[in-house]
Amino acid sequence: RRNMMNNKNAGNILADLQRLIDNGISIHTQVVLCPGFNDGKILKKTFRDLVALAPMVETMAVVPVGLTKNRENLPELRLFTSVEAQNIISQVEKWQDECRAKLGKSFIYLGDEFYINAGMNLPRAERYDGFPQLENGIGLSRNFLDEWENSSAAPTGCDKIENALVPVGESAYKLLKPLFDEYNNKYKTGHKLVAVTNHFFGKTINVTGLLTGRDILNAVSDFTEFNRIILPQVVLNKDLLFLDDISLTDFKKLYKGKVECAQNAKELKQLLAKQGG
């Protein structure tokens, strides 16, 4: 931790956590897992150290390191392989079972990227215990899939539906493509899910929330037969700005078509079912 953060005090994290606990503060923790640095035996020790601080340490999230293209003079890191992701899932599932028996909850939760990278099914919703780290992206995919499944929104007049482009990160594309194929086949619509390559931060950054306005515009520019786009709300901040400081207002001017935003699966399904006009 000291090496990765280039901070001689970064190794004092357990003392820092204990100080918070001593002052009555409960904590949700997150580990950014890096191959060869803090995985394997180090991850096991981290888990043991944190679970020993339960219940004041309420949860432990584990997410894979994301590497941007801007890494000059930084420690050399790499991404996890699919096999490594499978092994991590297998180990964490054992710890979850142990915690569910002792604490009544999983306690340790993996980022969605591990399951997508491993090509494995996401855990059931109950394994997320109410999604306490949803804001950190833990269980976001499971939450979306269940919300999509439970939403009853459907076209009432398919011939009047205005087909839309839906840009997402490459990770979400793998998850959502089967849903879109099934939807289009069922309702005879022609909505288009678009996988957007992240040129701003680097091609290995594949989450939707880190897409920029310009990268989205570039990705949809070839689909001139569409005049409507549905943006995931997560690409905008509270001031309706993308990460490259393009405003939603400017985006609408540049796209020159209808621009709508969906906060979640329910809203997306409602917009997909919306009639044109």
List where the protein language model places each region.
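Auxiliary Fe-S-binding modules of radical SAM enzymes
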Residues: 53, 66-277
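Short, surface-exposed connector motifs at secondary-structure boundaries
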Residues: 24-29, 160-164
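Aromatic/hydrophobic pocket-lining residues that form the small-molecule binding cavity
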Residues: 13, 43, 85-88
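Hydrophobic side chains in well-ordered alpha-helices
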Residues: 13-16, 46, 176-179
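Charged helix-capping and loop-helix junction motifs
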Residues: 8-11, 44-45, 243-248
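Catalytic cores of alpha/beta
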Residues: 39-51
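Core AdoMet radical
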Residues: 1-20, 26-38, 57-65
